[in-house]
């Protein structure tokens, strides 16, 4: 959880060295924030199409994407699109209310991962947008520090990515059995 009441400098200082480098790295990419003020009907379907291309399948119904559109129109969400020479290469959706925001969904054409930290900068732009809109907290989602060998590599990388933004950490212990000390 990133405390948006902190200054930009204080928030940025909590990022890992690699994340700070990627945010500061110069690119020719264009980042566009779409909220209720500039969103055009059915633009969420551009994210849906990109998501299907990236995942090679349809993972959600069109109806769920249209729910995200309603959230945007009701000032409860926003999108960040990233373009390379007018071609959409990344899209992220964020839920928000008057108090907090949740990093909800994201997709990026994988070929661009090696070129630049696209999503690093997307998160930074989201933080700036949320602060400007008086949001207090930004939830990036779960990030584990311990992994078993059977876990999905992609999920592990996503969680490490989120963890490297710093912020408020809460400790949670997951076990497959109840320790003897707690039985009885």
PLM regions with names:
Residues 76-181:
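Aromatic (often tryptophan-rich) hydrophobic motifs at membrane interfaces
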Residues 1-112, 129:
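A conserved beta-strand-loop-helix scaffold within acyl/acetyltransferase catalytic domains
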């Amino acid at each position: 959880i990133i405390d948006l009441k902190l200054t930009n400098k204080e928030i940025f200082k909590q990022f890992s060295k690699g994340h700070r480098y990627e945010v500061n790295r110069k690119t020719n990419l264009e980042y566009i924030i779409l909220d209720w003020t500039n969103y055009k009907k059915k633009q969420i379907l551009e994210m849906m199409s990109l998501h299907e291309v990236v995942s090679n399948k349809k993972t959600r119904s069109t109806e769920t994407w249209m729910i995200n559109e309603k959230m945007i129109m009701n000032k409860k969400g926003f999108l960040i699109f990233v373009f390379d020479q007018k071609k959409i290469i990344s899209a992220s959706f964020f839920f928000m209310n008057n108090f907090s925001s949740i990093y909800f969904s994201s997709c990026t054409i994988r070929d661009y991962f090696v070129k630049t930290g696209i999503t690093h900068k997307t998160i930074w732009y989201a933080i700036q947008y949320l602060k400007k809109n008086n949001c207090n907290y930004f939830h990036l989602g779960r990030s584990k520090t311990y992994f078993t060998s059977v876990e999905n590599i992609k999920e592990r990388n996503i969680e490490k990515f989120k963890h490297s933004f710093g912020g408020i950490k809460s400790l949670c212990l997951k076990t497959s059995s109840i320790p003897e000390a707690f039985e009885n």
